[in-house]
Amino acid sequence: MRSILILLSLLLTIAFASASFPYQCGPYSCQFGQVCRIDNGVSNCIPINDCHEVSLSTKVVGTWVDGSRGNKRFTQYDITITNNLNTNIKQIYIATDYTLRLRDHSNNSIWNVNLLPNGILTLPSYQPSINAHASFTFGLIIEGTQPANLNVLSVSF
């Protein structure tokens, strides 16, 4: 009985200590509608509307009907990630959903960005960061004319 009380006290102490320090968030740990913001190793989940450090903009490059693909309509987009900070963005994770209907799963349908198996987009190895007040653009071709839903999951600076 005494050892159970000691164990419970120890677990309660650990729980209290863990709750009083900022926890390390990542691209998978924040709730829907939140962004994991990591500033010099200190991380927290914030509402997506409060994340002014980075912005995504979508521009239509062109739309066409492809007869060789069953007369399907495709649209090419440029997606620009803009760093609004006075410091470099070290890493960014961008969420996608069912609206990212790539023309095919090749480098001809998405470029200048890494598409992970789980559908998350990250910076390519040749672009390890985005400089202060700079932008980085990647492109994609999707089926239809509706742009893909893209949301920042995590940003580290």
From Swiss-Prot:
Gene3D superfamilies: 2.60.40.290. This is Stalk-specific protein B. Keywords: Developmental protein, Differentiation, Secreted, Signal, Sporulation. It comes from Dictyostelium discoideum. Pfam families: CBM49. PANTHER family: CARBOHYDRATE BINDING DOMAIN-CONTAINING PROTEIN-RELATED, CELLULOSE-BINDING DOMAIN-CONTAINING PROTEIN-RELATED. GO terms for biological process: cell differentiation; extracellular matrix organization; sporulation resulting in formation of a cellular spore. Coiled coil: none annotated. GO terms for cellular component: extracellular matrix; extracellular region. The lineage of its organism: Eukaryota, Amoebozoa, Evosea, Eumycetozoa, Dictyostelia. InterPro entries: CBM2/CBM3_carb-bd_dom_sf, CBM2_carb-bd_dom_sf, CBM_49, Dd_Spore_Germination_Stalk. The gene is staB. GO terms for molecular function: extracellular matrix structural constituent; hydrolase activity, hydrolyzing O-glycosyl compounds; polysaccharide binding. Residues 1-19 form the signal peptide. It is found in: Secreted.
